[in-house]
Amino acid sequence: MILNGEEQNAIKYENEMNRDLINNIKYNFNDWDEYLKYGGFPILARKINFRRLSTNIVDMIEKVVNTDMVAIKNFTFENQTNSNRILRYLALQNAGDLSQNILAKYLKTSQANVKNILDILEKTHLIFSIEAYGTSSKRMKKTKKYYFATSSIRNALSENSGNTINDIKQYEGILLENHVASILFNFTQRGNDCFTLYYDANKKRNVDFILQQDFKNPVPIEVGRGRKDKKQITHAINSYGADYGIIISDTTTNIEKHNNIIYVPPKTFSFL
């Protein structure tokens, strides 16, 4: 569906999935919301204390920084501290609000050192980055967007650092964007016919992601908690010559296709 715009097979799969969940008497319909905040780590699956779950995730992150990253040549104790501060900084910002210059001033270090730390953090698979959609020169000029490997990592660090967002829907929307980014990025890393994930760098009516296969028309993807109108996705379809676009939100309770826009509920997208 994502790759070809054909929704029928996905609808069939969605119906089977919903039927299986309804017939599972042990299934808790809050599970998906809990997964968005605390999932992604099978080793922690049986823990039911959410505060303990977040603490365990933070402990794993610190182990990666303080043990695995230390094994890298010339990685100093100061940069261990900087790495932890960068991760917490990222957890409290929108994905596109990272300026290496501002971050360097915040850490009182050089931009080159910030870039080096971010590169190493990517190698640990705690975070990943995507570039702006466009020409090679545009991608070089625009800053990268950074996301966490799972939305639960972002949530754990945010809770641990003191989340400053009071609007729960806004916060869940940020987690959902990270979750979708993670799924799409992992898809592109499996050697699936040269797919690349980008973000939309347009300043007006930009969508969240653009997925492209080689030289084929791109697929714009918009993500949001709650209901989303079609203005942004329609603008992206027209701007980039896309055949169709995808909105991942609570606008519909099931997969629906209206003209050249496919609506997908967040839970369904997670299972596809």
Name each region found by the language model:
Residues 126, 130-272:
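A cross-kingdom feature that marks ATP-driven nucleic-acid transaction machinery
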Residues 2-156, 162, 168-175, 182:
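Interdomain hinge/linker elements that couple catalytic modules in large macromolecular machines
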